[in-house]
């Protein structure tokens, strides 16, 4: 009897890979499945994602590898920007195009009414999380209750819509429009679409969603899983942005060898030991480098006249 594994190529070992992959996630793939596939393609020893993106959404999914995982929480907290396609005239059972249409109504609004409605959602608002979401109630994801035909009480949550703009409007020819939304973490765009529909008096549901930015990271330079797979194995790690791509809001500080040694031991660096001209406000963050070429050592915070290490990296 032939061993079916005999003809398989040997599995290559994991390797140390550091950086952030700006992945353009395809439709229908969960964030976790995208992470598993990217980790396998890169043969990475350590990886983590920076917050989920619905399977029915496409677009930017930053994936952190190696030492970059130490900063993944920062992206979880960051604002997100989406392009959302909305259809007016009916709600749906899931809030998106996958659900059964409910409460079909006539659409009598025009572009001006849509623009006015959108403006009303800028700022801090309250949202009731949708039943078809991963948010947990009594230890179970809400979508499990929804699949069982149950509706449970959900507390409203406060989120912030930083900006919202009408990109395209098919009215009056077709009852649909596309908006660009920048919002705080935890915002449900499908719920926003439904609430806009109610404000317009005709109901609405989401028909498409694409994330175009997470904090300062954008789709510019993002790659697909197919593009990674097409690269030679040895070239794939070069598709990652460096760890400090996550730290661009931090002030760069270059230390000399002596100060760098103390910094890596967790010691604070006094202002007098920083490069001449270094100006850091109290409580501000710095990304710290040393050597030639410069190597990232970590992140520090300025407190009481000294730079204090907060997170060190080993690159």
Swiss-Prot record:
InterPro entries reported in the protein's UniProt record: PsdUridine_synth_cat_dom_sf, PsdUridine_synth_N, PUA-like_sf, PUA_sf, tRNA_psdUridine_synth_TruB, tRNA_sdUridine_synth_fam1_C, TruB_C
EC number: 5.4.99.25
GO BP terms in the entry: mRNA pseudouridine synthesis; tRNA pseudouridine synthesis
Pfam families referenced in this protein's UniProt entry, alphabetically: TruB-C_2, TruB_C_2, TruB_N
Keyword list, A-Z: Isomerase, tRNA processing
Molecular function (Gene Ontology), one example: RNA binding
Active site residues per record: 54
Catalytic activity entry: uridine(55) in tRNA = pseudouridine(55) in tRNA
NCBIfam families: TruB (TIGR00431)
HAMAP family per UniProt: TruB_bact
Family membership noted in the UniProt record: Belongs to the pseudouridine synthase TruB family. Type 1 subfamily.
Protein function: Responsible for synthesis of pseudouridine from uracil-55 in the psi GC loop of transfer RNAs.
Protein name (database record): tRNA pseudouridine synthase B
Species, as recorded: Cupriavidus taiwanensis (strain DSM 17343 / BCRC 17206 / CCUG 44338 / CIP 107171 / LMG 19424 / R1) (Ralstonia taiwanensis (strain LMG 19424))
Upper classification of the organism: Bacteria, Pseudomonadati, Pseudomonadota, Betaproteobacteria, Burkholderiales
